[in-house]
């Protein structure tokens, strides 16, 4: 009787353990999934021109940021993918923040105005750098006025 109880306990522990059985092993072993690189986050927004920054945040170079709108519905699918993603732009604001649009820094939960994201050259259109262009675009002017009016980091939460 004690041998059958011990055998039953061992079989029970094996059934509930996270061992890699032959039928469900990923290629390369059970640690292979952790070795994969960080991928680009899903595209979103009108014409798939933006990238997901969180489950309900979609930002793009020419779009600005959409929060909690129908354009962000696709971003919710990012939660179901097994590998992590990283959006473009340089780090800003909090530890997990990234420059999402000109003057906007987003993490997975919120976005804040950040003047450091204004100076990033990847967010300026080629027309702004042409020989005949001496003033800012209307969007940049509006963003600077908004930043001036808020005087600091105004946080927008969903």
Swiss-Prot record:
Keyword Hydrolase: no
Residue runs in coiled coils: none
Main localization category: secreted
Range of residues in the leader sequence: 1-19
SMART domains: NH
InterPro entries the record matches: Neurhyp_horm (IPR000981), Neurhyp_horm_dom_sf (IPR036387), Neurohypophysial_hormone_CS (IPR022423)
Record note on modification: Seven disulfide bonds are present in neurophysin.
Residue numbers carrying Glycine amide: 28
Presence of keyword Signal: yes
SUPFAM superfamilies: Neurophysin II
GO molecular-function term, one example from the UniProt record: neurohypophyseal hormone activity
Subcellular localization, as worded in the UniProt entry: Secreted
Annotated disulfide bonds: 20-25, 41-85, 44-58, 52-75, 59-65, 92-105, 99-117, 106-111
Keyword vocabulary terms for this entry: Amidation, Cleavage on pair of basic residues, Disulfide bond, Hormone, Secreted, Signal
Entry GO CC: extracellular space; secretory granule
Top-level taxon of the source organism: Eukaryota
Family assignment from sequence similarity: Belongs to the vasopressin/oxytocin family.
Function of the protein: Vasotocin is an antidiuretic hormone.
The protein's name in its UniProt record: Vasotocin-neurophysin VT 2
Organism (species): Oncorhynchus keta
